Amino acid sequence: MDNQEIKLLLIKKLNLEQANITGDSNHIKIIAIGNIFKNVSQVKRQQIIYAPLIDMIKEKHIHAVSIMSYTPEEWEKTKK
């Protein structure tokens, strides 16, 4: 599965407003932006993002994942 497919999967499954995926199958970096993260701890946010990817991780299609997650409001503050 390539980065674009991972992006579309996360957007669809998690109803994200935006997702940016970089890297390769050895290590991908995910920046996820969505209202699903409102009032959710960082640990829970990671669990939310891992859920749709777990089979790919188990099957070693993805080796390592770096996750940054934001609500739309947090993302706007981060961009400044």
UniProtKB/Swiss-Prot annotation:
Q: Check the record and name the InterPro entries matching this protein.
A: BolA, BolA-like_sf, BolA/IbaG_stress_morph_reg
The residues forming a coiled coil are: none
Known Pfam families for this protein?
BolA
Which family does the similarity line name?
Answer: Belongs to the BolA/IbaG family.
- PANTHER family per record: ACID STRESS PROTEIN IBAG, BOLA TRANSCRIPTION REGULATOR
Tell me what this protein is called.
Uncharacterized protein BU385
Q: Which organism is it from?
A: Buchnera aphidicola subsp. Acyrthosiphon pisum (strain APS)
